[in-house]
Amino acid sequence: MIKAERQDKVRQLLEEQGTVSVKEISDALGVSDMTIRRDLEELASLGEIERVHGGARSAQNRPHAMLRHEYSHSEKRTKHAEEKLQIARRAVELIEEGSTIFLGTGTTVEQMASMLPTFRLRIVTNSLSVFNLLEAREDCELCLVGGMYRRRTAAFVGPTAEDTLRALGIDAAFIGANGILDGDVSTSNMDEGRIQQLAFSKADSRYLIADSSKIGKRDFYTFCRLDNLDAVVCEPDIDDGDRAAIEEHTQVIC
């Protein structure tokens, strides 16, 4: 197993368990303790993890942690899958027949797209994945916002996408995020963040679609404030403290 594969596996184990010992990682990957220690030291130097006695813990488990690693589209599909399903089911209940809806990028929004009611809708999206899910739906009028293609998230971004969005009227926007902290909503990429910011500014109703693992985290680019949103759609069993943190700024829908 090459170093990049080992370190990806280490990130995955820490994401799932929070804290992992050197022996646990060594056994899981079938490599020596010394190799794992070198990997952990390198990841710690990048700020992705924290070294603890005998192992490591995820840096993202600290309160107010800065996200250091942007997960790929395929990696995100496997994380918090049940929560994403619950959020998507609740979010589609907010959609009204005949409305123009913006669906952003992200795996939770894709779950929404797969559950859309079978009535007439106009869907605007910069997500190739959302477009592919809906292109056979005859009851959905589709507008794919083109531009520069960002493969990591299957998203179209850049000036062309922004110019297209500026010309459109949107009834409701449903957008995901990587971090929610102190009322700020953030994502990992500035170009994607500008699209999300613009889509919210054009929408009459603005909904953030995010599971509670995003709360207390921040990422590189802040694209909106919770105070400017109509609601955050979360999973039903959100922690009381997390709910209270959001409700200081806007409504929580579960």
What are these regions (language model features)?
Residues 107, 124-128:
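Catalytic nucleophile loop
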Residues 2-9, 13-28, 34, 40-102, ...:
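HTH-adjacent hinge/linker in prokaryotic transcriptional regulators
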Residues 108-112, 215-218:
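Short glycine/serine/threonine-rich phosphate/pyrophosphate-binding segments
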Residues 2-12, 19-23, 30, 45, ...:
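Conserved phosphate- and dinucleotide-binding cores of soluble alpha/beta proteins
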